Amino acid sequence: MAGCDDPLGPQPWNETPIEVQLWSIDRTEHIGLPSAFDFFNRQRVAVEDPNSASGWDVVVSDVEGGLAFVPAGAFPDIGTDVGIAVITGVSFDDLLEAPRDADAYITDRAVPLVEGGVYVVRTRRAACATFGFSTFTPRYGKVTVTEIDLEEGSVVFKVVVNPNCNDRSFVSPEDD
């Protein structure tokens, strides 16, 4: 990604949210439909076995009374440090930065989703070239759930992901 290859600083990026729909991985009628999201590359992923691949960050799953994001690290064979932070008291639009406290991120269990809820996802670590050195760092994305359809087993959310290495800001450098 260009933001990680520029030794002079972060690249401008578009902070316009994209809308994403995912279906629960737990329902057989959804086989072949995207149930996971790759925040790093900002794309949906069809995952038939959550232990089979690591090219995604969260998967949608059924939990008692609703749907949830499950971070990749909650599955024993994947072992990533993807984390989900539940944000309270701040709207999606007003959330300007991801939490710094590592303890704010849930890495090992499902995070129930609510319509209007705001979340931050810390992606899996990936190679990032900065100042001629390669490091493995996450990206950060903010999410707000706009629709949950329990009968269909689907969730719709808006997401903004900062493409720059380990940058917690949700404000593009152009807007600073």
Residue ranges of model-derived segments:
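Surface-exposed, beta-sheet-biased, low-hydrophobicity segments with strongly acidic/polar composition
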Residues: C4-D176
